[in-house]
Amino acid sequence: MADKKSVAIVGSGNISTDLLYKLLRSEWLEPRWMIGIDPESEGLARARKLGLETSHEGVDWLLAQSELPDMVFEATSAYVHKAAAPRYAEAGIRAIDLTPAAVGPGVIPPANLRAHLDAPNVNMVTCGGQATIPMVYAVSRVVEVPYAEIVASVSSASAGPGTRANIDEFTKTTSAGVQNIGGAQRGKAIIILNPAEPPMIMRDTIFCAIPEHADHAAITQSIKDVVAEVQTYVPGYRLLNEPQFDEPSVVNGGNHVVTVFVEVEGAGDYLPPYAGNLDIMTAAATKVGEEIAKESLAATAGGAQA
């Protein structure tokens, strides 16, 4: 369709397959290719049944085609995307990176969605980042946040080989995002793979140090406003209870602190609802891809009219 941007999904695992279902519903993006390296991949088989062109010969195959996609969504691993990113750029393909490679600027929709719509490569940070950085941002836009710490607890069953291979990059990339996008002066990220059966829904705890005389009501309202914004693309994102304000103590390092508890229930497109950590990643990536497509199509239409 002329009014949709063509898309290739690189990677054929859990995240890529869930992403495919979201992209198929998009009014702005048309998934046409799925690329993997395993010929027996369930993701490739599903994509074929849904009418996509598939290959297990990787990025080499995709870039050798006579028709190239307008946009690539990559959900492989950090080191794979680092190698492929310059090749996408050379071919003029916009890249949305769902690995922790962080080749391009990180994007968390409530915080900085519109800042990087013209970037050739954008990074979706991490699942923990997508769930928690909006809360740090909600606090830091009201008061100074000298330190923020996030703890993401996800079901072990939702963490495939790619997630496990990227654990070190996860903590580095998320910590950097807490600072650079969330607005904290210092940030720390911790991920817990919870082995409980039946699998637990994704839960996140966000600690933000705040000034002594901070306006608690303004912080609480800002948090609720950002939660509502995230819910426009992840309906299962919710506060578990009211933000909690604590006086300085030995436990919190002598800081005045606000603590936010959220949980993320997935939409159940391909992954089970407990895998909210993966669902928020694919939903946020779809949101960013759609905004890039809208901007690009609007610019094209404007140029044609001129």
UniProtKB/Swiss-Prot annotation:
Active site: 127 (acyl-thioester intermediate)
GO molecular function, one term: acetaldehyde dehydrogenase (acetylating) activity
The EC number(s) this enzyme carries: 1.2.1.10
Catalytic activity annotation: acetaldehyde + NAD(+) + CoA = acetyl-CoA + NADH + H(+)
Binding-site positions, NAD(+): 12-15, 158-166, 277
SUPFAM superfamilies: Glyceraldehyde-3-phosphate dehydrogenase-like, C-terminal domain (SSF55347), NAD(P)-binding Rossmann-fold domains (SSF51735)
SMART domains to which the protein is assigned, alphabetical: Semialdhyde_dh
BP terms from Gene Ontology: catabolic process
UniProt-listed InterPro entries: Acetaldehyde_dehydrogenase (IPR003361), Acetylaldehyde_DH_C (IPR015426), NAD(P)-bd_dom_sf (IPR036291), Semialdehyde_DH_NAD-bd (IPR000534)
Keyword set, alphabetical order: Aromatic hydrocarbons catabolism, NAD, Oxidoreductase
Enzyme class: oxidoreductase
Protein family (similarity comment): Belongs to the acetaldehyde dehydrogenase family.
Alphabetical list of NCBIfam families matching this protein: ac_ald_DH_ac (TIGR03215), PRK08300.1 (NF006157)
HAMAP family to which the protein is assigned, alphabetical: Ac_ald_DH_ac
Protein's name according to its UniProt entry: Acetaldehyde dehydrogenase 3
Organism: Mycolicibacterium vanbaalenii (strain DSM 7251 / JCM 13017 / BCRC 16820 / KCTC 9966 / NRRL B-24157 / PYR-1) (Mycobacterium vanbaalenii)
